Curated annotation (Swiss-Prot):
PANTHER family: GTP CYCLOHYDROLASE 1, GTP CYCLOHYDROLASE I. Keywords: GTP-binding, Hydrolase, Metal-binding, Nucleotide-binding, One-carbon metabolism, Zinc. The lineage of its organism: Bacteria, Bacillati, Bacillota, Bacilli, Lactobacillales. Its EC number is 3.5.4.16. The gene is folE. This is GTP cyclohydrolase 1. GO terms for cellular component: cytoplasm. The keyword Zinc applies.
């Protein structure tokens, strides 16, 4: 990540909106923003493979559900935050991930400029590709600051998106069971 370029760009934005970039409260802002971007975009170029490839053998194929995984990310359209909760269900195929690994999977894909629909897809596909799940079902509910702070200005509006892979694609009863276990 080119932090010098980010700092220069932030200074230009400060000046472009009519502020004094040398004012006491703004002098360190370009460097702060560059450090923040390093942190919140730390998922760029990463996948969840390192997290999901460490799994444990299991003899049954009962559904695993982890819900209310809090995340925050940046909308790629306006570079404003959106945040919420991810709910994950999957059917193991002889291997299960450690529970923290599901949260880490959400984190990896949320640490980059993102849209909610793609976040759903990337999490579900990671469970299928790296864990070898028989099925994956991901529900994300989020509030988008680009709707709350600007434009339509409707704070508190939740957007829900879902994606189903494998067994969840064709088995409505399985999806319904996942919804119930997720409390949705």
């Amino acid at each position: 990540m080119d932090t010098q370029k980010i700092e220069a760009a932030v200074k230009m934005i400060i000046e472009a909106v009519g502020e004094d970039a040398n004012r006491e409260g703004l002098q360190e802002t370009p460097a702060r923003v560059a450090r923040m971007y390093q942190e919140i975009f730390s998922g760029l170029g990463q996948t969840a493979e390192e997290h999901l490839s460490k799994s444990f053998e299991i003899i049954d194929d009962n559904m695993v559900v982890e819900k209310d995984i809090f995340f925050h990310t940046m909308c790629e359209h306006h570079f404003l935050p959106f945040y919420g909760r991810a709910h994950i269900a999957y059917i193991p195929d002889g291997r299960v991930a450690g529970l923290s690994k599901l949260a880490r999977t959400v984190e990896v894909y949320s640490k980059k400029p993102q849209i909610q629909e793609r976040l759903n897809i990337e999490v579900a596909d990671a469970l299928m590709d790296y864990l070898g799940a028989k099925g994956a079902f991901v529900v994300i509910e989020a509030e988008h600051m680009c709707m709350s702070m600007r434009g339509v200005r409707k704070p508190g509006t939740a957007t829900l998106t879902t994606v189903a892979r494998g067994l969840f694609e064709t088995d409505k009863d399985l999806r319904d069971q996942a919804y119930r276990l997720m409390g949705l």
